[in-house]
Amino acid sequence: MDTGVKKVVLAYSGGLDTSVIVQWLIETYGCEVIAFAADVGQKEELEGLREKAIKTGASKIYIEDLREEFARDFVFPALRANAIYEGTYLLGTSLARPLIAKRQVEIARAEGADAVCHGATGKGNDQVRFELTYMALEPNIRIISAWKDPNWHFKSREDMFDYAEKHNIPLPLTREKPYSSDRNLLHISHEGAILEDPWAEPPEDIFTISLSPEAAPDKPTYVEIDFEQGNPVALDGARLSPAALMEKMNDIAGANGIGRVDMVENRFVGMKSRGVYETPGGTVLWAAHRALESLTMDREVMLMRDSLIPKYAQLAYNGFWYAPEMEALQALIDETQKKATGTVRMKLYKGNSIVVGRKSPYSLYSEDFATFEKDQVYNQMDATGFIRLNALRLRIAAMKK
């Protein structure tokens, strides 16, 4: 049977789904499978991946270090926007998928592949993030979405475990502990198994990059973070590359029990899902960045920018990273960051990330104006007319009652 697919590039993680998909693609399409794994900070999850992909049936595998690009071009732009989804989620997985899909398309072009493939389920957000990126960057490329393919005969993860065992496919997880985890420089997410019950407390053994607050040190840790135009550039005076800064900040914050989130979120496809996240470094950087802006950003600019945070987060969460409205929104955000330069001192203690100091050469804060002591620059009597003018509509409304 001629499927029209001779060569496909698969976004490969070595997890249950993509491990099975390699063999399934070969059986179903009779095609060559090129695996692509992006190093976005998942560390030990990449160990043995090359041998495993080839053993499973891939003709070759690309394993590329994209950590710097991920931090610089995806995490930091979202940080400049203070992006947070539904007031809780710092978008760790959402930001990684467009980068992985972009590089996957580039490899497909270079290899002359007919199609790209991913292992995201038909119920989740990642399918949308991958496929919107494919279409935005290579409109005519064929997309094989395994879970939505009519030839996909697996009904559950149990079916996939059976298939993997039949074909001697090694897996990083077991039937007894089938949590789905996704790790990068910004976070690690945990889903599935007992976590599907929103009443069940997450077991401590799922946490990977953060201590529990109870186990964190009894003394606080202080860290100073330098920013330049909204981007973190140094910790305690030592300049670091974007990826190195994220890694070190994760270590410091994780050791102090910071960044654990347990939330029920609204997926783009319409259902709710429960996710448990560890975002230690990102949690501290987000708080520090906002603290710096409190010094340097004009009030009305801040009000306007803050009104756009939910929209920015929604676009990123829903997979529209390469949409024209996202490009326009990022340009506006970056305009607000031109003077977001300075240093913020953070106190980290048992799960708490506390701002205890901030300074900037562009600070709009003036002790002369803000002091409660006697000053020479502000006549408090001027406030009388200001208040009466602002109360005018309230007084008129009261008179008409």
UniProtKB/Swiss-Prot annotation:
Keyword Glycoprotein in record: no
Keywords for this protein: Amino-acid biosynthesis, Arginine biosynthesis, ATP-binding, Cytoplasm, Ligase, Nucleotide-binding
Binding-site list for L-aspartate: T121, N125, D126
Residue numbers binding ATP: A11, Y12, S13, G14, G15, L16, D17, T18, S19, A38, G119
Native organism: Syntrophus aciditrophicus (strain SB)
GO biological process, one term: L-arginine biosynthetic process
Protein name: Argininosuccinate synthase
Subcellular location: Cytoplasm
InterPro entries found in the cross-reference section: Arginosuc_syn_C, Arginosuc_syn_N, Arginosuc_synth, Arginosuc_synth_CS, Arginosuc_synth_type_1_subfam, AS_cat/multimer_dom_body, Rossmann-like_a/b/a_fold
CDD domains referenced in this protein's UniProt entry, alphabetically: ASS
